[in-house]
Amino acid sequence: MTNLNASQANHRNFILTGIPGTPDKNPWLAFPLGFLYTLTLLGNGTILAVIKVEPSLHEPTYYFLSILALTDVSLSMSTLPSMLSIYWFNAPQIVFDACIMQMFFIHVFGIVESGVLVSMAFDRFVAIRNPLHYVSILTHDVIRKTGIAVLTRAVCVVFPVPFLIKCLPFCHSNVLSHSYCLHQNMMRLACASTRINSLYGLIVVIFTLGLDVLLTLLSYVLTLKTVLGIVSRGERLKTLSTCLSHMSTVLLFYVPFMGAASMIHRFWEHLSPVVHMVMADIYLLLPPVLNPIVYSVKTKQI
């Protein structure tokens, strides 16, 4: 019990930083962030509304797209409000429990998005492999259970993280190097060994995001094998074009994450705080903004 309360006894709040070295420009950064937030809500809200009111879009593909849009909105609502409070209202403080809650939701919705992308990849495979039985295979019940399974997995793997953080003592700086709370940043402020936290975080990344990448690649290999079996070249290209939106979304989500992870691993000691901040922001902020644009441009039904 003493260890569990140690962090709260030492730090009752954290200080979230804006972009390092630009305190005078922080208010101006609120405008593009506010624009991104508004664009995210409008874009994903429009996707949800169009799918709801248009009967021709009541198909498995668009139900999965609705889940993706809801996830994007939830992820944005977990990050952007705290960023706006820093840049717009100059209110960088966040209480310890609120920081842990924000960290929990950011990681949960990040893993949910990864799981939804895997589901959408196999949705494309089923649609191409068994077009005549597509709707009968991916029924409403199957889609609902898939969504519940994706959310349950995310909650279960992230659930221990708040308790691991609460067991750490924070007796030095309480300044976080980001505009929102993340597990890796919070544990770096601890004045005790974080080996367990680091090991658990690595396990989560490998067995969630890593596994999801492999499953997505597998689905595309199976899809490509099916497409190559189509005799007509025109039909092959037409079939492949139905996967472009999903492929773009996958690249938007995984490439920034892998790029950031690679750079941090190789150049950790030489990277400036600004680079850390920008990489994290690209990974968390851009996909929710760009996903509805990608689907609107590349999906003529929407």
Swiss-Prot record:
Tell me which Gene3D superfamilies the record gives.
Answer: Rhodopsin 7-helix transmembrane proteins
Cytoplasmic topological intervals: 49-56, 123-141, 220-239, 298-302
By its UniProt entry, which InterPro entries does this protein fall under? GPCR_Rhodpsn, GPCR_Rhodpsn_7TM, Olfact_rcpt, OR51/52/56-like
Where in the cell?
Answer: Cell membrane
Q: Which residues cross the membrane?
A: 28-48, 57-77, 102-122, 142-162, 199-219, 240-260, 277-297
Q: Which UniProt keywords apply?
A: Cell membrane, Disulfide bond, G-protein coupled receptor, Glycoprotein, Membrane, Olfaction, Receptor, Sensory transduction, Transducer, Transmembrane, Transmembrane helix
Where does the UniProt entry place glycosylation sites?
N5
According to the lineage, what is the superkingdom? Eukaryota
Q: Give any Gene Ontology cellular component.
A: plasma membrane
Cysteines engaged in disulfide bonds, as pairs = C99-C191
GO MF annotations in UniProt: G protein-coupled receptor activity; olfactory receptor activity
- Please list the residue ranges that the record places on the Extracellular side of the membrane: 1-27, 78-101, 163-198, 261-276
* Entry membrane topology: Multi-pass membrane protein
This chain's function reads: Odorant receptor.
Per the record, the similarity remark reads: Belongs to the G-protein coupled receptor 1 family.
Under what name is this protein listed?
Olfactory receptor 51H1
Organism per entry:
Homo sapiens (Human)
**What's the name of its gene?**
OR51H1
